[in-house]
Amino acid sequence: LSGKPAKXHLSVGEQAIAMT
């Protein structure tokens, strides 16, 4: 996920984890 956007290629659950 480093250097990549947290949306679009991730599911809602994955986004929440990445945002935490």
Swiss-Prot record:
Top-level taxonomic group: Eukaryota
Stated name of the protein: Cytochrome c oxidase subunit 8B, mitochondrial
Annotated GO biological process: oxidative phosphorylation
Annotated compartments: Mitochondrion inner membrane
Entry's family note: Belongs to the cytochrome c oxidase VIII family.
Pathway: Energy metabolism; oxidative phosphorylation
Annotated organism of origin: Oncorhynchus mykiss (Rainbow trout)
Keywords, ordered alphabetically: Membrane, Mitochondrion, Mitochondrion inner membrane
Subunit structure: Component of the cytochrome c oxidase (complex IV, CIV), a multisubunit enzyme composed of 14 subunits. The complex is composed of a catalytic core of 3 subunits MT-CO1, MT-CO2 and MT-CO3, encoded in the mitochondrial DNA, and 11 supernumerary subunits COX4I, COX5A, COX5B, COX6A, COX6B, COX6C, COX7A, COX7B, COX7C, COX8 and NDUFA4, which are encoded in the nuclear genome.
Membrane-related topology note: Single-pass membrane protein
Disulfide bridge map: none
GO cellular component assignments: mitochondrial inner membrane
Chief location category: mitochondrion
